[in-house]
Regions:
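Long, compositionally biased, glycine/small-hydrophobic-enriched stretches that function as flexible linkers
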Residues: 1-163, 171-176, 184-212, 239-245, ...
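Conserved, well-structured core segments that form the ligand-binding/active-site neighborhood
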Residues: 202-330
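Hydrophobic alpha-helical bundle architecture
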Residues: 353-420, 438-448
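Alpha-helix-loop-beta-strand connector modules within alpha/beta enzyme cores
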Residues: 143-144, 194-232, 276-293, 350-367, ...
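Catalytic cores of alpha/beta
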Residues: 163-170, 240-253, 308-309, 383-397
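Glycine-rich phosphate-binding active-site loops on the catalytic face of alpha/beta enzymes
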Residues: 178-189, 252-269, 320-321, 392-415
Length: 519
C-alpha cells in the first residue's frame, strides 16, 4: 500500500519492534502464571457446565476447591485428568462429585502424566471437533452467500432481556446491520463468575451467558438465511472472566469479541497481573475459533483528550497487535480500535480525525479496524448528532475502516429505539454508497495539515513505545500514561487469584489451539 500520508516506515518498524519487545517481556510473566478464570475456562472446554443448588457455576465450584486445596498451580486439566484416571468419571461427573462432597481432589493419589493425558485427550478432541464444526459452519455460510465488501455496519442492542434483544437484533439485521453486539449488563466485568441460563433482567445491557449466546446465534442465523447473508454476533470478553467468555463464544459460534489487553486494568480496576494472564488465553481461544477481536483504544478518549492523546491510542494499537501475535492470532482477526472523539468546537478536527484514521489504515493494512462513533461531544441535539455521525461515516469510508459502530442521534439521551438504529443505518448506507470510491480519488497535500498531523502522532507514539520498552508495561500503567488513568501493580481486583504454575502444570487447549484456526 502506497502511503498517502508520506509516513516514515522506519518509525513504524521501530514502533512495532518496541511493541514486540514489550509483549515478549510480559509474556515471560504470563507463561509462569495462571489464574482462577483461566482454569475455569479449561473446565468449561472440558465440558463442565451447569450450576449447583446455590446457583454457583460448577466450573467455579471445581476451581474454588482447587484453590482451597492449594492445587490451582497444577491446573484444572491435571487435577481433573487425575480424578478421571482414579474414578473413571468424565469431567462433568468429577465436578458433580466435588460439588456433592463425594470427591476431594486433594486426597487422590497422583497418577502419571501419561495416564492423565490419555484420560483427558478424548475430551479435548471432542471439544475441538465442536469448535471446528462452528468454524466450518461460518465458513460455509460465507462461501454460499459471500462476505460484505466495505465497512461492516455494526449496531448494539442493550435491553437487559435476551428475548427483547432478539426482537431488536432481528429488526436491525433486516434493516441492514452486518454485526449485532449484545451489550453486557452494567458491572458484569466485575463478577468473578459467568451467570447461567437465559436472562431477562439486566441493567444497561444483558448478561453474557452461554444460553444467551446460543439463543441470539440461532436468531441471527434465522435472519441470515432469509436474507442470504451472514450476520455476525459480537459480545464482550473483558473483565474478570475473559477466557471463560471466549470459550463460551467459541462453543456457540460468536464471530466478534471485545478483547483488549489493557481495558480491564484501566477502566475496571482489575489487577494488571490478572488481566495480562487472562487476555493471553482468551486470545488463543478467539484465534482458533476464527473470531475477530476488537480492542478498546476508543475508551482512552473518554478520559483523555483525543487531540493531545492521539499518540497513546496508536501506541496501544501496536501493543495490542503484539499481544495478539504472541497469542498466535492472524492480522485479519485484529480489530484494532480507535474513535471519532475530537472536540468539534476545535478548528480542523475533521482533518485530524481523517489523519488518525488513514494513519491506522496504512500502519495496520491487514487489520479489520474497529472505528467508534462520537459519544463524548454528543449533546442531545439530535440534528447536530446526526451530522456528527455523518462526518464519522465519511471518515470511515474514506479510510476503509472495517467494523463501523454506527453512531446514534439519540446518544446521551436514551438507549436507542429501533427507529434510531434504522436512521443510523440509512445514514451510513447513503454515505458509503455515494462515496464508495472517493478515498481512492484523494491524495493529501505534502506539508499539509493531514500529513503533518499523522507524522507527528507516529513520531510521538514511537518515542512513547521506546520509553515503555525501557520501563516495562506494568510500570507504564502505574504512571498513568494510558487514558490518564494510574493503576498500581499490586492493586485492583483479582490479584489473589493469580498463582505461579507448578512443574506438572499443562493447558491442553493452548497446546492444540495456539497459532491455528479451526476448520
Amino acid at each position: 500500500m502506497e502511503s498517502k500520508l508520506g509516513l516514515n516506515f522506519e518509525l513504524v518498524n521501530r514502533a512495532r519492534a518496541s511493541a514486540a519487545k514489550i509483549a515478549d517481556d510480559t509474556q515471560q510473566f504470563i507463561d509462569q502464571h495462571t489464574t482462577v478464570t483461566v482454569e475455569r475456562a479449561v473446565c468449561r472446554l472440558l465440558g463442565i457446565d451447569g450450576v449447583n443448588d446455590m446457583d454457583v457455576p460448577l466450573p467455579n465450584v471445581v476451581v474454588d476447591h482447587l484453590m482451597a486445596n492449594s492445587l490451582l498451580p497444577v491446573g484444572a486439566a491435571w487435577a481433573i485428568g487425575n480424578a478421571m484416571v482414579e474414578t473413571g468419571k468424565d469431567p462433568q461427573g468429577v465436578a458433580e462429585a466435588v460439588n456433592s462432597g463425594e470427591l476431594d481432589l486433594g486426597k487422590i493419589p497422583a497418577h502419571s502424566d501419561a495416564e492423565i493425558r490419555a484420560a483427558i485427550t478424548p475430551v479435548v478432541n471432542a471439544t475441538m471437533e465442536r469448535i471446528n464444526k462452528n468454524v466450518g459452519k461460518r465458513n460455509a455460510y460465507l462461501k454460499e452467500w459471500g462476505d460484505k465488501e466495505g465497512p461492516y455496519l455494526y449496531i448494539i442492542v442493550a435491553t437487559g432481556n435476551i428475548y427483547e434483544d432478539i426482537t431488536q437484533a432481528k429488526a436491525g439485521a433486516k434493516q441492514g446491520a452486518d454485526i449485532i453486539a449484545v451489550i453486557r449488563t452494567t458491572g458484569q466485568s466485575l463478577l468473578d463468575y459467568v451467570p447461567y441460563g437465559a436472562t431477562t433482567e439486566g441493567f444497561g445491557g444483558t448478561y453474557a451467558t452461554q444460553e444467551n449466546f446460543r439463543l441470539m446465534r440461532a436468531a441471527l442465523d434465522e435472519v441470515g438465511e432469509e436474507q442470504h447473508r451472514y450476520i455476525r454476533l459480537c459480545n464482550y470478553c473483558s473483565g474478570l472472566c475473559m477466557p471463560e467468555i471466549a470459550a463460551m463464544g467459541a462453543l456457540e459460534r460468536l464471530d466478534v469479541m471485545l478483547n483488549d489487553a489493557l481495558y480491564g486494568i484501566l477502566f475496571r480496576d482489575i489487577n494488571m497481573q490478572r488481566t495480562i494472564v487472562d487476555q493471553y488465553f482468551s486470545r488463543v481461544i478467539n484465534g482458533y475459533a476464527g473470531v475477530i477481536i476488537n480492542t478498546g483504544e476508543d475508551n482512552y478518549l473518554t478520559t483523555d483528550d483525543a487531540i493531545t492523546a492521539a499518540h497513546t491510542v496508536l501506541a496501544s494499537q501496536f501493543i495490542n497487535e503484539a499481544f495478539a501475535k504472541t497469542a498466535g492470532m492472524r492480522e485479519e482477526q485484529m480489530g484494532l480500535g480507535h474513535a471519532f472523539e475530537m472536540d468539534p468546537a476545535v478548528e480542523d478536527t475533521f482533518l485530524y480525525e481523517l489523519a488518525q484514521a488513514q494513519m491506522a489504515r496504512e500502519i495496520f493494512p491487514n487489520a479489520p479496524l474497529k472505528y467508534m462513533p462520537p459519544t463524548k461531544f454528543m449533546t442531545g441535539n439530535i440534528f447536530r448528532g446526526h451530522i456528527q455521525d455523518a462526518l464519522f461515516n465519511m471518515v470511515t469510508i474514506l479510510t476503509n475502516q472495517k467494523l463501523c459502530l454506527l453512531g446514534m442521534m439519540t446518544e446521551a439521551i436514551h438507549t436507542p429505539f429501533m427507529s434510531d438504529r434504522a436512521l443510523s443505518i440509512e445514514n451510513a448506507q447513503y454515505i458509503f454508497r455515494t462515496m464508495k470510491d472517493l478515498g481512492d480519488e484523494l491524495t493529501y497535500k505534502e506539508g499539509g495539515i493531514i500529513r503533518t498531523r499523522a507524522n507527528e502522532v507516529l513520531t510521538k507514539a514511537t518515542d512513547l513505545l521506546s520509553e515503555i520498552e525501557k520501563l516495562g508495561l506494568f510500570t507504564t500503567i502505574e504512571k498513568g500514561i494510558f487514558a490518564d488513568v494510574k493503576r498500581p501493580k499490586d492493586g485492583g481486583k483479582g490479584l489473589a487469584d493469580v498463582v505461579i504454575k507448578d512443574d506438572k502444570y499443562f493447558n491442553p487447549f493452548i497446546e492444540v489451539m495456539k497459532g491455528k484456526v479451526g476448520a
